[in-house]
Amino acid sequence: MAACIAAGHWAAMGLGRSFQAARTLLPPPASIACRVHAGPVRQQSTGPSEPGAFQPPPKPVIVDKHRPVEPERRFLSPEFIPRRGRTDPLKFQIERKDMLERRKVLHIPEFYVGSILRVTTADPYASGKISQFLGICIQRSGRGLGATFILRNVIEGQGVEICFELYNPRVQEIQVVKLEKRLDDSLLYLRDALPEYSTFDVNMKPVVQEPNQKVPVNELKVKMKPKPWSKRWERPNFNIKGIRFDLCLTEQQMKEAQKWNQPWLEFDMMREYDTSKIEAAIWKEIEASKRS
């Protein structure tokens, strides 16, 4: 009987060895295979084309329907408005017709005193028959076909100013490099200011601005050279806001300049020039010219 028990024991041990050998040949279960592949090494995504890949939702576009729509900003060039007291409307009407015809050939952009412009003109004495000049607009003057503007720039330490006729046939292009306003309607005092306020790179690139955006106002105040100046800019009749008078004049000189002050002129209603009706009539002429 002992021999039978020993034979059965050895048979059971042989069967267990054969079973373990068979398990090593079989493929592992799916759960074990997943645990093996999901190790510390992270699989790289093949991109959004892979089925089931995560795609972020599009950003919502929020439209405020209660916000009032900003009206289109219209600009009427100042040379279209005749001077006060002129009583010959036919002459100005004929001039405006010629001005509108010229604007169909040459694009005259919106610009103000303080804007930086680049003007290209025909020059028979230049190598390429054209010349360019970049500078800051320091003054706009004249009415009708005689409208002019002055550009100023400091080149090699020397101040250079060129007065361009706005409707001159030699003007080929007027490019606004930087559109902005200043605190004053005339910047002729830059002639007496430090050169750094009139120095601009001739290769300056244009500054992009939205079409309906308000024109920015540059509140820069310049420092002046020591006296004498070309004019007495400190006197109230010039009404200059863009000069640091506290750095170049004493308190006694400022009090002396106030002797020429005429504060009653601010309340003189006869000096006001209402151009609303004239502007409305001119806009009708401009719209009719665009349709023709």
UniProtKB/Swiss-Prot annotation:
Coiled coil: none annotated. GO terms for cellular component: mitochondrial inner membrane; mitochondrial large ribosomal subunit; mitochondrion; nucleus. GO terms for molecular function: structural constituent of ribosome. The modification Phosphoserine is found at S77. It is found in: Mitochondrion. InterPro entries: Ribosomal_bL19, Ribosomal_bL19_sf, Translation_prot_SH3-like_sf. One of its GO terms (biological process) is mitochondrial translation. The keyword Kinase does not apply. Keywords: Mitochondrion, Phosphoprotein, Ribonucleoprotein, Ribosomal protein, Transit peptide. It holds the Pfam family Ribosomal_L19. Its main location: mitochondrion. The keyword Ribonucleoprotein applies. Belongs to the bacterial ribosomal protein bL19 family. Component of the mitochondrial large ribosomal subunit (mt-LSU). Mature mammalian 55S mitochondrial ribosomes consist of a small (28S) and a large (39S) subunit. The 28S small subunit contains a 12S ribosomal RNA (12S mt-rRNA) and 30 different proteins. The 39S large subunit contains a 16S rRNA (16S mt-rRNA), a copy of mitochondrial valine transfer RNA (mt-tRNA(Val)), which plays an integral structural role, and 52 different proteins. This is Large ribosomal subunit protein bL19m.
